[in-house]
Amino acid sequence: MELKVFRDVLPAAGADCTAKAELPLETELLISDYLPPVQRIVKCFAKPVVLQKQLAPGRLTLEGYLRCTVYYQGEEGAGLCQTEQKLPFTKALELPSFAATAWTACVEGQTEYLNCRAVNPRRIEVRGAYGLVVSVHAQLSTEVITALSEGGIEQKPVTLAGVRRAATLEKLVTIEGALTFPKPPAAILDITGTAEVRELKRMQGKAVAKGVLHVLCAWRAEGDAALRSQTADLPFNQILDADGLSEDGRCLCVLEPVGFAAAEGETTEDGSASTTLTATAMLRLSGWRPYQLQCVADAFSTRFETTLTPQTLATESLLCALDETTVLRGSGPLPDAGAQILACFASFGPVSLTRQEGRAVLTARAVVSAFAENTLGEMECYEKALDYALPLPADLPEDADAYPECWLSVQDLQCASAGGALDVSLTVRAEGAVLARQTASLVGAVELGDPLAPADPEVSLRICYAQPGEELFAIARRYHVSPGQMLAANDLPDGTARLDEARRLLVPGV
């Protein structure tokens, strides 16, 4: 008799690979005439901004720019000054060849080294390298057996649950607003920001993200070397086209500022100055749709020899969403006990997921750079490394692997000098999600062979001495009888799959 096989498709977890690459940095920065000449280099930073990702068989191509920012001490008491340059790059990373119906690539990294020197008061030379770490995760639509019928077939069902990646979108957006200073600024040294997505509406094929970008500006007034700070809130409302997104899915949205531009404004009658501020930010949207599918984990026939071809696949599930804030504190001695802190910055290395004392923990290394003026009037940079560790709000099963799809941002940073030591307090916000992968063993193919030998008519009773932990389905397969008949013949409760204790089982005749 012909066996009927029913199949369906589920989004199995696909490739999981990591690639590393180096972005060389070699450039010269010319100091504009309206900026003070260089007296002393304080610190140089490099940060990549990835604008496009293109996946081809065996290759991932990244396009973007590397922002090189140099802080220096200006001549003739000009104080702390800043200049920057954007260096475009295209980088191809070699990957294993794999098929995918959906994929995501998370780009992280850290500065490997930077050598910065002033060739003359109007020219700065920078040499260095930035190390990229790219994690690629894919899903692949895979056909599975969901049911079998006829041919005396018995099957062991298992329900697989997970998420289908419905949308992965990265879009560069522009947010405009006003930044008001109490008096016209002589120099704007740095503008940073943190975003807050307050409302996310999703509909068929679209998403609407609303929120506020909190901006913090470090600036200096005319004739004053002291740094001042000014804040502003820029509301945003972005409509995103995301095919595959639906109202019943799970959706996360993160906005990361990548650049700011301030245009000269007008001075009002009270002496304040209003500046037009344009923020460039990377809007990241991830959407998943949950699914459940009943599959066949094992099978046999009560009438024919049965040959099974196993199938092993991994499912992907959303372990937890992240929107957690953690405070890191540290201190260390200052080379000059009388140094005065002027400004501070923080950067993060790659995020990883480890198990510590049985719990899954998100870890990263944060480096705080504090600019200070020593007792000789020279500006220097002091650094303090902090270890970031965030226990996940959900338990990770022992048989599961997980990977983070999240971003770290600075919510607050305070540096102070007290008693000859540098005290640092860094508030870190983690946004995104953690996905888990679990392996399942299924039946990939079934083939019926010759009919089984007829039962011995002289054997009227068969008894099986079952051991604790044995599966009822395995016992039934051993004797080529239906598991349902085994339940009925031994008065076992419906749904019994495994024996809790040793017992004698009556094996019904075929």
Task: Please report, for each region that a protein language model flagged, where it lies by residue.
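Primarily a LysM-type cell-wall glycan-binding module
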Residues: 449-488, 493-510
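Membrane-lipid interaction segments
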Residues: 1-450, 455-458
